[in-house]
Amino acid sequence: MLTLDTLNTMLAVSEEGMVEEMILALLASPQLVIFFEKFPRLKNAVTADLPRWREALRSRLKDARVPPELTEEVMCYQQSQLLSTPQFIVQLPQILALLHRLHSPYAAQAKQLTESNSTFTPALHTLFLQRWRLSLVVQATTLNQQLLEEEREQLLSDVQERMTLSGQLEPTLAENDNAAGRLWDMSTGQLKRGDYQLIVKYGEFLAAQPELMQLAEQLGRSREAKSVPKKDAPMETFRTLVREPATVPEQVDGIQQGDDILRLLPPELAALGITELEYEFYRRLVEKQLLTYRLHGEAWREKVTERPVVHQDVDEQPRGPFIVCVDTSGSMGGFNEQCAKAFCLALMRVALADNRRCFIMLFSTDVVRYELSGPEGIEQAIRFLSQRFRGGTDIASCFRAIIERMQGREWFDADAVVISDFIAQRLPDDVVSKVGELQRLHQHRFHAVAMSAHGKPGIMRIFDHIWRFDTGMRSRLLRRWRR
């Protein structure tokens, strides 16, 4: 069967103009205009999606099949082009019958042309074919427009669903244009309103706990940029004036031990006049232990040093992926559970803004994994937020899972974050040793987010940084009072 792409090529019908016209009409639709005004960050993300839309529309037109009736009419037209005028006159009754049987829009006009002219001349033959081709072009264009209109309705429906999802999650997850673009890319999944409302709920909880959001910002961006000299930088001479004691005495500055007879203190001279103390005086003189006045002055001199030239590169500390381990034991239930989930949502926000990965592991008796920054990040986040914290505590398994994950090449600069109340058994020596090796040799950093003031110091000593967010009633009331 004839494809629409082949038909367009045969009749020299250009679909590019129709595709561009449809895209412009879609962007000018009232739904998108209102959406762009409300969420300007997402406008760039939608605009960046236009090449994919164009390619999808071209692919749809290319693969579309032409109806059998139109295919048969086009084949008849092509065969008729090869006939001479006498041959065409012989075939004309069959051609008219075919057009009538196919209910061609050109059938009535073709019949009128033949009946209104008693003699079928070569000029009439050319006119017949030209008008027939024009009718076929109109039919092909109409077919293109029908398919594009169907695609426009489907595309508009999909875009509206994604706009609804992205618009709901934008205040929670989109911090900048980069995050808005990644959020738009993740909105392609089949999600219902009740699903993503869970993210909105925890986003509202996070907004009500600004200290928790601030803590996530500080942890996520705790690696500052630093300046380092360029490699093989030339040396330059650097001169400074330094002040140092001079050899010329100017004033009494204190008392010291020595053998300077001219600066002896009066008590030392008095000892020389006593016979019993005379030998003691000479002993102390030889050993330079006599008390004397200390006299000296000050002088300035030029100190010459060499250092690399001051031109420096700004070497930003690497911001690698997050590997977040969340304690799902029973002691982490209730308000602790809400805070832990909201904190992970805040880290997801930081990861989207900084183009980083965010990998979540839940540990109790088993380890469950979610990646919140992948193409299915929203679905993964919903599954994570739907979990309940009712297990036991096996923090050693958590660390072993982190260590195993960090062996991968794509995780060489990852930061580990452990969220727990740290009321657990001590870590095995092999785990402590391996964590120390990762910190020392590979510069991996381990962060602890302590949800309780009663965490065991022996466990928390292993971390590079400890971020405290006490969820006790007293601390919660104090935070509310300060706000």
UniProtKB/Swiss-Prot annotation:
Q: Which InterPro entries match?
A: Uncharacterised_CoxE, Uncharacterised_ViaA, VWF_A, vWFA_dom_sf
What GO cellular component term, any one, is given? cytosol
On subunit structure and binding partners, the annotation says: Homodimer. Interacts with RavA.
- UniProt organism field: Salmonella paratyphi C (strain RKS4594)
Q: Where in the cell is it found?
A: Cytoplasm
Which CDD domains does the annotation name?
Answer: VWA_YIEM_type
Entry superkingdom = Bacteria
Q: Which UniProt keywords apply?
A: Chaperone, Cytoplasm
SMART domains in UniProt? VWA
Family designation: Belongs to the ViaA family.
Protein name, entry field: Regulatory protein ViaA
| Listed SUPFAM superfamilies | vWA-like
Q: What does this protein do?
A: Component of the RavA-ViaA chaperone complex, which may act on the membrane to optimize the function of some of the respiratory chains. ViaA stimulates the ATPase activity of RavA.
